[in-house]
Amino acid sequence: MAASGSGMAQKTWELANNMQEAQSIDEIYKYDKKQQQEILAAKPWTKDHHYFKYCKISALALLKMVMHARSGGNLEVMGLMLGKVDGETMIIMDSFALPVEGTETRVNAQAAAYEYMAAYIENAKQVGRLENAIGWYHSHPGYGCWLSGIDVSTQMLNQQFQEPFVAVVIDPTRTISAGKVNLGAFRTYPKGYKPPDEGPSEYQTIPLNKIEDFGVHCKQYYALEVSYFKSSLDRKLLELLWNKYWVNTLSSSSLLTNADYTTGQVFDLSEKLEQSEAQLGRGSFMLGLETHDRKSEDKLAKATRDSCKTTIEAIHGLMSQVIKDKLFNQINVA
């Protein structure tokens, strides 16, 4: 019974995150030093600022990053990723946490973190992990996956001196709320570069107090298409992890775990609606009503989408609780 429940929980998680199994463990883990040196010497990303289009993350690297992000609670955490490059794809093989000071809005790396980083990479090479640092990750607890002004500056600096490099952002709070990993991978454009107009990106809820920071810098970077993979070794390790932790799925509730997050979402939504109402009220006394109305209606439409998202997540959490109650608390004894 426990084994079947564990297997079902693992398959559900893998399907939700579109986890793909690598055809051969040697194929994905083989490190060709000569090939990597040739890529570094050619530097194709300098000729095309949109060169890297894909980001592949191993299942265990993903779990390590998400667990680290979740352990930080409402504080941001930071770590480094090891990997390699394969054409237009950046492959993240492993990750490790950094000893940094975190706040609710930023992470600050001190000298000790840089020393730890250098020592970790050196020791990893001694045990046969030849991959180099390929990026950094940090968390945005409760406010989505995007790059703030500080993140953009940090990533620009990394791309200037440590190419190839990618920035990954994880939202552990929304991951629990939605039941699917909320993660984004990004690369910045060089200073002064004006990117071509692109189609609308996937919509995500941005808190009112973060909208300005998001809007000012959103054209300075682009998102990579993220996918996840697992090898046969990953599969065995994941099975061991699921055998230990799958019961948490039944014993926990997103309604209780994320109660503060849901309350914050409702409060943020009320502020957005009040702001839109005030702008619509002023619009009747202004000239050029069409442009003003369109902006106000756009804000109302976004507030509606945010409301629907919060409602759906709450309903899913409630449905999960009802199903568990029916299964375990209302068994009719014949």
UniProtKB/Swiss-Prot annotation:
Q: Which SMART domains match?
A: JAB_MPN
Q: In which tissues is it expressed?
A: Widely expressed.
- Catalytic activity, EC: 3.4.-.-
GO molecular function list: enzyme binding; macrophage migration inhibitory factor binding; metal ion binding; metal-dependent deubiquitinase activity; transcription coactivator activity
Q: Which SUPFAM superfamilies match?
A: JAB1/MPN domain
Annotated compartments: Cytoplasm, Cytosol; Nucleus; Cytoplasm, Perinuclear region; Cytoplasmic vesicle, Secretory vesicle, Synaptic vesicle
Give residue ranges for domain MPN: 55-192
Signal sequence interval, chain numbering: none
Q: Which InterPro entries does the record cross-reference, listed alphabetically?
A: CSN5_C (IPR040961), JAMM/MPN+_dom (IPR000555), JAMM_MPN+_peptidase_M67A (IPR050242), MPN (IPR037518)
Q: What job does this protein perform? A: Probable protease subunit of the COP9 signalosome complex (CSN), a complex involved in various cellular and developmental processes. The CSN complex is an essential regulator of the ubiquitin (Ubl) conjugation pathway by mediating the deneddylation of the cullin subunits of the SCF-type E3 ligase complexes, leading to decrease the Ubl ligase activity of SCF-type complexes such as SCF, CSA or DDB2. Promotes the proteasomal degradation of BRSK2.
Subunit-level organization = Component of the CSN complex, composed of COPS1/GPS1, COPS2, COPS3, COPS4, COPS5, COPS6, COPS7 (COPS7A or COPS7B), COPS8 and COPS9. In the complex, it probably interacts directly with COPS1, COPS2, COPS4, COPS6 and COPS7 (COPS7A or COPS7B) and COPS9. The CSN complex interacts with the BRISC complex. Also exists as monomeric form. Interacts with TP53, MIF, JUN, UCHL1, NCOA1, BCL3, GFER, PGR, LHCGR, SMAD4, SMAD7, ITGB2 and TOP2A. Part of a complex consisting of RANBP9, RAN, DYRK1B and COPS5. Interacts with CDKN1B, HIF1A, ID1 and ID3. Interacts with IFIT3. Interacts with BRSK2.
Q: What else is known?
A: The CSN complex is associated with some 'Lys-63'-specific deubiquitination. Such activity is however not mediated by the core CSN complex but by the BRCC3/BRCC36 component of the BRISC complex.
What name goes with this protein? Answer: COP9 signalosome complex subunit 5
Can you name the source organism? Mus musculus
